[in-house]
């Protein structure tokens, strides 16, 4: 257990940040699942909309160091390839 006021404060800050980061990661996963469902249903309009939302969330998460920038780029690339295959 933390003994100093500084250590107690750092624990509070870490727990708060962990909760916020987990929430954002969960939101990203949810939007990506919606995108994949739209792809499976061959719904181009919904897929376009969900791709845009997911790409935006991924970029923001990478910018805030919630996920690595290369991971965000890789996920966007894979989603774009699936969207392109659906349209073609």
UniProtKB/Swiss-Prot annotation:
Alphabetical GO biological process terms: translation
Keywords linked to the UniProt accession: Ribonucleoprotein, Ribosomal protein, RNA-binding, rRNA-binding
GO MF, any single term: structural constituent of ribosome
Annotated stretches, region: Disordered: 1-25
Biased composition regions of type Polar residues, renumbered to the chain: 16-25
One GO term describing the cellular component: cytosol
Presence of the UniProt keyword Iron in the record: no
Family matches, as NCBIfam families: S20 (TIGR00029)
Family affiliation: Belongs to the bacterial ribosomal protein bS20 family.
Function: Binds directly to 16S ribosomal RNA.
Protein name as it appears in the record: Small ribosomal subunit protein bS20
Organism: Dichelobacter nodosus (strain VCS1703A)
Lineage: Bacteria, Pseudomonadati, Pseudomonadota, Gammaproteobacteria, Cardiobacteriales
Gene name for this UniProt entry: rpsT
């Amino acid at each position: 257990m933390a003994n100093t006021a500084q250590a107690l404060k750092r624990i509070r800050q870490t727990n708060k940040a962990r909760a916020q980061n987990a929430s954002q990661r969960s939101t990203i996963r949810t939007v990506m699942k919606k995108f994949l469902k739209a792809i499976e249903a061959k719904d181009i309009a919904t897929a376009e909309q969900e791709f845009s939302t997911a790409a935006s969330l991924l970029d923001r998460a990478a910018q805030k160091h919630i996920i690595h920038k290369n991971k965000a780029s890789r996920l966007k690339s894979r989603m774009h390839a699936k969207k392109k295959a659906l349209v073609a």
